[in-house]
Design a protein with these regions (language model features):
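Residue(s) in the substrate-gating loop at a strand-loop-helix junction
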Residues: 144
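Conserved glycine-rich cofactor-binding loop
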Residues: 17-19, 41
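Substrate-binding pocket helix/loop in short-chain dehydrogenase/reductase
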Residues: 101-102, 109-111
Length: 241
């Protein structure tokens, strides 16, 4: 995949109804790609898809489902292929964050974090893989700097993101001989509603979702012989404390 061929390709973006996923969707649509965005709730997914489709008619599919369920991801993959013909890019972005000391963390919070941030990516990749092998496509996972840097109150989130970085690097080795490229983007602080945060004016120093969207475009337009496998992204000028 390169600059001349990105137009009219199809991307499936999990967790695409807001934040990072929505920002990536906007940038790919701006480049002429078809985009499927996913979310867990039908109403939210349809509303986000309509917002994009109003500007990019005929280029957007909203498909709801839970990445934790393989059956849901198989459905979403099928709907994407039926609508656009194939899947050329998978952006595995859906994620959750539960934070607190190991004494406070509940079994439910642990399971939801691991099942969404790690098992959900496995399900997304498995459901899309036949199409991606056929198209010699690109898998991009959205991890975090928490995938290589641990912090207090982050046991579940750290475990899920460390695991995601390892998973992505391993499948990169599995799939490169099949013509499928695999990268992981590891952002630091991003302006979004993630983990219950409400964006405000003080977030201007943070990475913006569209910044990561432009980075995905750069990866897709890069010379096919080049593969940045692990990309750490930090705000260039964090606030003074």
């Amino acid at each position: 995949m390169n600059k001349e061929k990105i137009e009219k390709k199809t991307a499936l973006i999990t967790g695409g109804t807001y934040g990072i996923g929505f920002g990536i969707a906007k940038e790919l649509l701006e480049k002429g790609m078809n985009v499927t965005i996913t979310g867990r709730k039908e109403e939210t997914t349809n509303a986000a898809a309509k917002k994009l489709a109003d500007k990019y008619p005929g280029k957007v599919l909203g498909s709801f489902g839970d990445v934790r369920r393989m059956a849901d991801m198989n459905k979403i993959s099928k709907e994407t292929r039926e609508t656009f013909g194939n899947i050329d890019v998978l952006v595995a972005n859906a994620g959750v964050g539960h934070f607190g000391s190991i004494e406070e963390l509940t079994e439910e919070q642990w399971n939801q974090t691991i099942e969404t941030n790690l098992t959900g990516v496995f399900n997304s990749v498995k459901a899309s893989l036949p199409a991606l092998i056929d198209s010699k496509g690109y898998i991009i996972t959205v991890a975090s700097l928490a995938g290589t840097n641990f912090f207090a109150n982050g046991s579940a989130y750290n475990a899920s993101k460390f695991g995601l970085v390892g998973f992505t690097q391993a499948i990169m080795l599995d799939l490169r001989q099949k013509g499928v490229k695999v990268s992981t983007i590891m952002p630091g602080s991003v302006t979004s509603h993630f983990a219950g945060h409400t964006p405000n004016d003080e977030d201007q120093w943070k990475i913006q979702p569209e910044d990561l969207g432009k980075m995905v475009v750069d990866l897709l337009e890069m010379n096919p012989r080049t593969l940045p496998s692990k990309i750490e992204v930090r705000p260039s000028m964090p606030p003074k404390r």
